[in-house]
Design a protein with these regions (language model features):
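Catalytic core of tubulin tyrosine ligase-like
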Residues: 173
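Active-site-proximal cap/lid insertion segments
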Residues: 1-8, 15-170
Length: 177
């Protein structure tokens, strides 16, 4: 199956293999459309998650009674697939995330040893996903951790490893580098 992620990764790998990349500094932003509609990924990834359910715990029981009205309207407009068991089943979403993870690996593995020595690799996202928490799906005008707590993984050329637990913003990236 050929997807947008394949194309983006192929172009990124081709870019890294150009002779100029060995001699000149560069910035490369690799941005994938998955896991958004139409949730296109190879069938083997979909099969892997066909029976996968994400347990929401207490977040599945929120009736939104004490929440702003727009949350209730959002829940009505986009009904959550989460049942009384509190399990979220969306194999396409999880399959696309796994597929994109493999595509990111392809791009990182295409870096030459010399490029790895002086390249920052930053992995992040623009938003999270409600996945049925609080009876909501997708993203929207809410400040739940499900939407705002997104990954930010930075590998600096120096390879310094540490974890930062304080809130940060994308605006902090450039000063960090």
């Amino acid at each position: 199956t050929f997807t947008w992620a394949h194309r983006i990764s192929n172009r990124a790998v081709d870019f890294l293999q150009q002779p100029a990349r060995a001699e000149e500094p560069f910035l490369m932003v690799v941005s994938y459309d998955e896991p958004h509609h139409p949730f296109t990924c190879p069938v083997e990834y979909l099969e892997k998650y066909a029976d996968f359910y994400y347990e929401l715990g207490e977040k599945a029981q929120d009736d939104l009674a004490n929440k702003p009205e727009h949350h209730r309207l959002w829940a009505q407009a986009m009904p959550s697939p989460v049942g009384d068991d509190g399990l979220y089943h969306h194999p396409l979403y999880f399959a696309c995330n796994d597929f994109v993870d493999d595509q990111i690996g392809r791009v990182i593995n295409a870096l030459t040893p010399e490029q790895r020595e002086n390249t920052w690799v930053i992995y992040t996202s623009d938003h999270g996903e409600m996945m049925g928490a609080h009876k909501l799906i997708s993203k929207g005008a809410a400040m739940y951790d499900d939407i705002t707590r997104i990954p930010l993984i930075i590998r600096s050329p120096q390879g310094e490893r540490r974890q930062v637990d304080t809130p940060v913003s994308h605006i902090d990236l450039l000063p960090t580098m």
